[in-house]
Amino acid sequence: MAGIHALDRLIGNDYPDLLTDEEVRAFEQVPYADRVAAESTYDAIRLGAERNPDGAAVQFLQNADPADTPLVITHRDFIARVTQAANMFHALGAEKGDVISFMLPLVPDAFVTLFGAEAAGIANPVNPLLEPHQIAEILEAANTKILVALGPMPGTDIWQKVEQVRPQLKHLKAIVQVFGGGDPANGVFAFGDLIKQQPSDRLVSGRKIRGSDIAAYFHTGGTTGTPKLVRHTHANQVYQAWALNLLLKGKPGANLLFGMPLFHVGGSLTQVLTTLSSGSSLVVLSPSGWRNPNAVKNIWQLVERFKPEALSSVPTVLAATLAVPPGNADISSLKYAAGGGSAIPVAVGSAIQEKLKLPVVEVYGMTETSSVHTLAYPGRPIRLGSVGLPMPYSRVRIVQLDADGRLIRDCKPEEIGVVIMAGPGVFGGYLNDEHNKGAFVDEVWVNSGDLGRLDADGYLWITGRAKDLVIRGGHNIDPAPIEEIMFRHPAVGFAAVVGQPDAYAGELPVGYVQLKPGAKVEPGELEAWVRERTPERAAVPVQVIPINPMPVTGVGKVFKPQLRWDAAERVFTKVLAPLVERGIDCNVKVGPHGSHGSIATVTLAGLPPDQREAIAGEVHVLLAPFVMRHEVVQA
C-alpha cells in the first residue's frame, strides 16, 4: 500500500521528522532515484489526484471575497483537463521539443495550460506585464510554436500585446485564445472549443515522458539584452514538489491561499506543483492574485474561511498583511508563515512572530534551482534572518572565486563568500549557451551571484547580492545591513539601498524608502536615524529619499535597477544644473542599455545649429568623470 507521501516509494504512513543533520544524512543513504515515484510533472499530478480524486484541486475566487462561492475543480477533473490540453497541443502540431508559451492571468485554464504544455512539449510561461518588445524577445528566443493567451477583455491589454508581437514570431504556428471566440482562418483558435474535442483518459501522442526531458523554459534576469531562458527538466521540477511535501508534510485536502504568478517558479512549482501532487487544494484568490487589493484587505477572513496551515507569499505581501488587524477572525489554522523570492526583513519576520505568533519559514533558491533549495526545517529552531538548511540531496557551499568565476577555495564558517549550489533541482544550463559562461563552478555547482555565509551548524545566511554591492572607492558596501536599519524606523514600510554615481568614489550609497500609509518624517530624520545606528561611516547613505510606490518586479521584489537609474538621474541633473541656469533646455533620462547595462541620455532642446556641438561638448566634459556611459541627443 502507498505511504503518506504520494511522490515517494519508500516513506510509510508517517513522514520522517529529520530533526538533526545526522537524520538527514541517514535518510540520504538511499539514492534519491530509488525514492522518487514520479518521472514527470504529469505523473506527479496524476499521483496527487489518485490520493484525493473527488477533493478540490482548484477553488477559484473572482475577487478575493471570502463570502463568494468558489468555482471548484476536483483533482479527477483537473488531471482529465490537463490530459485534454496536452492532446489539444499535440493536435496543433506540438511534439516533445516544441514550445508552448502562454500569457495568462490566474484563471483555471492557466494551470491546465502549464501542465498540459509540459506533457505535450515544453511550457514557457511569460510575464504578461512586460513590454511588448520584451515579450517578443522571449517568445523568439524560445522558438515558440504555440501561444496561449487571454482574449480581448476589459481591464487587460494581453491580447493587444499579442497582436503587436505576432508579426515578429517566425516559428509561431497557432494562437489559442482563452475566453475568446477565436479566428481559425487567421490561425487563432478558441481554447474552449478545441479542448472539448480531445479525450481525457490518455495522451494521444503515446508519449512516455522521461525525467531528463525538458519540461519548461522560464525567463529570468534583468530587463536588457537577450532574455535568459532557464531550462528545467521534468526531474528538476518533480524534485521541488517531492522535497517540499517531505519537509512540510503535505497531505490531501489541505488548502493554500494562492496568488503568485505562474511565470515565477515560486508560484508554479513551490506552490502549485507541490500542492497538486499531494492531493491538496489551491484557493486562487483572483485572476490577478495578490495584486488584487482585496487579497490583502480580506486576508484574515480568507484564512478563517479556508483554514490554510501556511501564510505563504513574497516578503512584500507578508509585510502588507501586517498592516491589516486580524480583528475577530479565527486564524488558528495557521501554523507558520513562509516567504521567499527576496530576503524577509528581520523587522517583518519579528513582527509576524510577535503579532501573529507564527514561526517564519524563510526559503531560498532561484529559477536556476527550480525554486527552493534551502529552508528552515519545521521542527527545528527558527533562526530569524537565516534561510535555513539545504533540502535533502541538495548541497550548498560558500566559496571565493577569481575574476573569471573559477574556484579559489571554500570559505570558513561565518566567512562571507559566493553561494554555490548543487542537487536534483539544479538546472543543466540556459537555452542560449552564451549565457552559460560563468553560470557554473566546476560544472555542477550553479553560481547564485549571491553573497552569504554558513554558520557553525550549516545554516545559510544571505548577506547580499554580489551585483547589489555599493562599491565606494574600491570598498565593498553590503546594502542589506543598512536596509535593515532603515526598516526599523517606525515610519518605514519598505527600504532599499543602491549606489549613486560619484565622480570621485565611483559610487556612494543612497537610500530609498516607502513610508507606511499615513506616516510622515521630518527632513533629515531618516538620515540621522541611519547615521546613528550604522557603525561603518562609509556605509551611511548620503541621502534617504521617500518614494511612493517603491518599484517592484512582477513577483514583488524591489526592482533595484529602477532605483539606480533614478539616483543617477538626480546626480547628473545636479551636475548639469549650470547649463540649465544659462537657459539651456537640458533633460537627463537614465535607463537600460543592451551593451552597457545602463546609459544616461541627455536631451538638448531648442539649440541653434551653430551651438549644438559646443554645448554637447560641455555635457561630455561635465559627465566624463562618471563611470556610467552617456549620450547626447539634440531635439
Where are these regions (language model features)?
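Conserved AMP-binding/adenylate-forming core of the ANL superfamily
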Residues: 37, 54-107, 111-114, 131-136, ...
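Conserved AMP-binding/adenylation subdomain of ANL enzymes
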Residues: 118, 238-255, 263-309, 324
